[in-house]
C-alpha cells in the first residue's frame, strides 16, 4: 500500500509540474507575443486569458488539487453558443424622433449581453449557473416596438435620468428659481418625467466585442429641466464576469443629477418564478422612510430591528409580508438604503440557491434602491412569452438619495457648470 501511495504521489507531482509548465508558458506567450500577430483576439480576451492564467498558476503553486486547476482552466470558456438564444437585430431596427434604433451584442468572461440604443437598455443578460448551464437573467422584451409602446413596466433595463427615483410634487427651488417638472407618478416626478433618458435614442460613440459607449444630450427646457445635460455612459462586460456601468455628465446650468440603471433580475432566469427565495445582503444601517406615495419624509432612520434590515443575508420573502408601515407603503420592498462606507466598494449581494448564481453589486454611490417587483401583475409577457409575474423580478439601483434636491440634510445632487458628475456601478456574477 505504501508503494501504491508513493506512486500516486509521484503521479500527482508530475501532473502538477506539467500543468504548471503549460500555464506558465501560456502566460508568457500571451503577455510577450505582440497583439498585432493575433488580431482575432480582442483586448478583453487577452486580459481575460492573462487573468485566468495567473489564477491557474497561482493555484498550482499553492498545490491545489488537479480538479481545481482543471475547473479554473475550463472557466476560459463562456456559455456554449447552443445554450444562448440571441434576439434578432432586425426586431430592434426602428426610429424614434428621427433617430434610428439598433441592437448590440457584448461578450465578456462567461457573460453575453444584448443592449438597444433606445433608452440604452439592457435587453438580455446570459450567465451560467453552478453547473455551467446558461440562462437569461434580465427581464426584457423581444422588440424595440414593445419598449416604445410598452404595455407594462416602462423602465425595463433602461438608463434613468436626469434624476432617478422621485421628486416630490415635481418641483424644487435652486438658486432662487423654482423649477416645475412633469407629474408622471401620483402627482410627483418619477425617473425624469414622461420623456426621461429611457425614452430617447442614445448615440453610440464606439462599440467593440465587450464594451459600448453611449452618448446623449438632454436639452435644456425638455419637460422643464433647466440645463443642457450631456451624458457619456459606458457598458462593459469584464473578463471576471461583471457588467460594469460608468457614467460621466456635465451641464451648462445648475440642476440636480442622479443617473442609474433600471435592470430587473431573476437569477433563476424565469420571469414567472418568484424572487422571494433569493437571498439578499445590503451594506446599509439606515434608510430614508417614505409616505404612501413613496416620497421621503426627510428623516434618516436606523434599520435596527426593522424587516427592512438586510445586513445579515436572508431570503427576500422572510419578512416581506410582515405588518410594517414602510412595507405597507411600498407594497413590499421599494426603498432607498443609505449605504455604509464610501468610495468604490461592494454594497450588496443577491444569491439564488437553486441555480447557485451570485450577483455582487459594487458602486461609489451613497444609495441603493431595492425594489422587489411589487407592481408586476403577470399581464405583460417577456421576450420569451412568459408572464412577468408579481414579485418575480428584482431591481438593485445604485443612486443618490431620492428627492435630495428638496432635503438639505441629504447628500447634495446639484451639478453646476464646470463640474463633472461621475458614477460607477458593477454587477459581478459568480456561483457557489
Language model regions located:
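Extreme N-terminal basic, low-complexity initiation segments
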Residues: 2-10
Amino acid at each position: 500500500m505504501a508503494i501504491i501511495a508513493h506512486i500516486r504521489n509521484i503521479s500527482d507531482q508530475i501532473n502538477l509540474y506539467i500543468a504548471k509548465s503549460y500555464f506558465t508558458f501560456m502566460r508568457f506567450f500571451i503577455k510577450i507575443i505582440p497583439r498585432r500577430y493575433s488580431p482575432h483576439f480582442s483586448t478583453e480576451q487577452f486580459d481575460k486569458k492573462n487573468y485566468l492564467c495567473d489564477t491557474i498558476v497561482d493555484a498550482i503553486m499553492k498545490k491545489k488539487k488537479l480538479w481545481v486547476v482543471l475547473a479554473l482552466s475550463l472557466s476560459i470558456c463562456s456559455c456554449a453558443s447552443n445554450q444562448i438564444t440571441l434576439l434578432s437585430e432586425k426586431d430592434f431596427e426602428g426610429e424614434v424622433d428621427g433617430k434610428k434604433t439598433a441592437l448590440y451584442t457584448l461578450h465578456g468572461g462567461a457573460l453575453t449581453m444584448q443592449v438597444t440604443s433606445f433608452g440604452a437598455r439592457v435587453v438580455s443578460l446570459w450567465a451560467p449557473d453552478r453547473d455551467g448551464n446558461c440562462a437569461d437573467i434580465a427581464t426584457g422584451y423581444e422588440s424595440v416596438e414593445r419598449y416604445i409602446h410598452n404595455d407594462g413596466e416602462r423602465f425595463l433595463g433602461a438608463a434613468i435620468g436626469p434624476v432617478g427615483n422621485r421628486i416630490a410634487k415635481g418641483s424644487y427651488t435652486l438658486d432662487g428659481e423654482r423649477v416645475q417638472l412633469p407629474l408622471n407618478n401620483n402627482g410627483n416626478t418619477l425617473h425624469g418625467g414622461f420623456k426621461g433618458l429611457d425614452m430617447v435614442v442614445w448615440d453610440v460613440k464606439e462599440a467593440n466585442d465587450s464594451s459600448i459607449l453611449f452618448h446623449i444630450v438632454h436639452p435644456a427646457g425638455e419637460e422643464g429641466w433647466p440645463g443642457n445635460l450631456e451624458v457619456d455612459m459606458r457598458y462593459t462586460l469584464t473578463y471576471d464576469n461583471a457588467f460594469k456601468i460608468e457614467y460621466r455628465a456635465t451641464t451648462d446650468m445648475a440642476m440636480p443629477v442622479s443617473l442609474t440603471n433600471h435592470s430587473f433580475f431573476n437569477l433563476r432566469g424565469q420571469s414567472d418564478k418568484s424572487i422571494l427565495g433569493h437571498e439578499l445582503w445590503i451594506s446599509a444601517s439606515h434608510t430614508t422612510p417614505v409616505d404612501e406615495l413613496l416620497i421621503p419624509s426627510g428623516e434618516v432612520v436606523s434599520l435596527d430591528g426593522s424587516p427592512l434590515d438586510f445586513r445579515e443575508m436572508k431570503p427576500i420573502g422572510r419578512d416581506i409580508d410582515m405588518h410594517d408601515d414602510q412595507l405597507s407603503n411600498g407594497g413590499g420592498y421599494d426603498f432607498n438604503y443609505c449605504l455604509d462606507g464610501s468610495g468604490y466598494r461592494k454594497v450588496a449581494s443577491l444569491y439564488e440557491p437553486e441555480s447557485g448564481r451570485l450577483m455582487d453589486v459594487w458602486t461609489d454611490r451613497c444609495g441603493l434602491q431595492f425594489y422587489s417587483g411589487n407592481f408586476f401583475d403577470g399581464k405583460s409577457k417577456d421576450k420569451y412569452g412568459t408572464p412577468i409575474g408579481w414579485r418575480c423580478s428584482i431591481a438593485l439601483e445604485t443612486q443618490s438619495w431620492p428627492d435630495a434636491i428638496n432635503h438639505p440634510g441629504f447628500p447634495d445632487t446639484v451639478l453646476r457648470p464646470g463640474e463633472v458628475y461621475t458614477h460607477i456601478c458593477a454587477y459581478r456574477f459568480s456561483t457557489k
